[in-house]
Structures are given as C-alpha cells and as structure tokens.
Amino acid sequence: MSKYSDFWFDNRRTSLVDDLLSDDKPVKKGKDHIALAGHKRAIGNFVRIVSGQNIPVKFPSRGDSFTDGKSVTIGATINERNFDYVVGLALHEGSHIAYSDFNAFGDARNLSKIREFELTHYKMEFFRGMINYIEDRRVDNIVFRGSPGYKGYYHSLYNKYFNGK
C-alpha cells in the first residue's frame, strides 16, 4: 500500500456498480481496470496541477518516463504498491513543463561550438546527461520547497531511483 496516498484510496469499492450491488461474494483478485483508470486520472491531475497546464499524460506498458514539453509519458507499472513513486515521477515530469527551458541544451551546445570544443557523440551524451541531472535537481527543489505536501511523493521517487530502497 502506498504510504502517502492510501488515505484517498478506496479499497472497498472500485465502481458505482459495486455501490449498487449488495452481494456478499468476495471480489476475485486480478487486474482492476476501473481502479487503474482512476489511478491514471489522478496521476494526470497531478501533472496538470504542478504544470499549471492541460497536459496530456501517456501510459505506455513499458519504457522511460519523460516529457517533451507538450506531453508527459509515464513508463511505469501503476498499482497501489508503487503509486507514490509514480506520482513522484509525474510531479517531476510536470515540473519540467512548468520550470524548464527546453531550448537550453541546444543553446549550450551551440555555445560550446563557438569555443571550438570538439563534441563527439560520447561527449555530447555526457554533456546532455550532466545538464539533465542538474536541471532535475533544480526543478525538483522548486516543487519540493513550494509544495511541501508533495514531499512524500518525492521521497518515494528518490528512494526508488537513487537510494536503492
């Protein structure tokens, strides 16, 4: 169970149909598509809140999580156990939309060409990775300080990706 979001999960019922039916049969374990749709909707809401824009959120079955500045892609399995860190991912990617300059890397790359710094593909990827790391910490810090209610989601994200928990 998610530590920071379990207070608003409804683990007893997942649909209006459940509310209308009064049978005593236990619900079979399995993928709850209604709950999954609710989780995706909630994650999309987090992106829209932190970015301040109506940003579409995509949920491929696998892959990386990222933003191109116009949409957010969350490439993680979503369930109640990992929901907190997935919300952390969504907040992180949404914060890039709100606070990142998506032209900055290209501008920095062009400046390095002016200085006659020979950029091989390897150096360019290293350079891009370093800029991304710094930018990630910067935008996370902005949201972390400005919205203390999201701290738990960020802690879950960092524990998953950086602290080995």
Task: Name each region found by the language model.
Residues 1-165:
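Basic/hydrophobic alpha-helical interface regions
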